[in-house]
């Protein structure tokens, strides 16, 4: 009986070690994927717990710049640079700012060193070609769940867990970009200058050149 129990414990330990090793491999693949992201345009659909659905395009120009461009009638645009993340509300005509480390897309901008410093991997769940990663952002004390497709090596979904809401962002199409128009990532004081340009899909796609690679 003791021998059987001992063998069972050994088998369990070996299975745990194998699972841990596999998780480390998948996490390494995920980190490598993040490192390869340089300049991209991402079509996305965002839905919250209350059923509100909005669409937009996320532009990333590493290491610091991004633009979360929601399409009308949703009234927000979020522009991030090295020093600030600025959000403009076209309906309220108001600006709010946070530090770059607090923005919800920060993990896409981090390099490997900063990622390990600012984020904690809490769990990895494998489901065939998909694995779900739960990460904890130490600076904002928020959790997110990332759905990563191992076959095509691409993020498919991001869930952001807020106090009374869950925001689910589905990445519909990811395009590599050769060059962005500089004005996409500039945010001037709307009280002195005009507000950031409000762009629909066809307009924003004229402001970058798709990479041929």
Swiss-Prot record:
Species this protein is from: Rickettsia prowazekii (strain Madrid E)
Stored Gene3D superfamilies: Lipoprotein localisation LolA/LolB/LppX
Keywords: Signal
Source organism superkingdom: Bacteria
Cited InterPro entries: LolA/LolB/LppX, OM_lipoprot_carrier_LolA-like
SUPFAM superfamilies for the chain: Prokaryotic lipoproteins and lipoprotein localization factors (SSF89392)
Name listed for the protein in its UniProt record: Uncharacterized protein RP864
A Pfam family recorded for this sequence: LolA
Signal peptide (UniProt feature, chain positions): 1-21
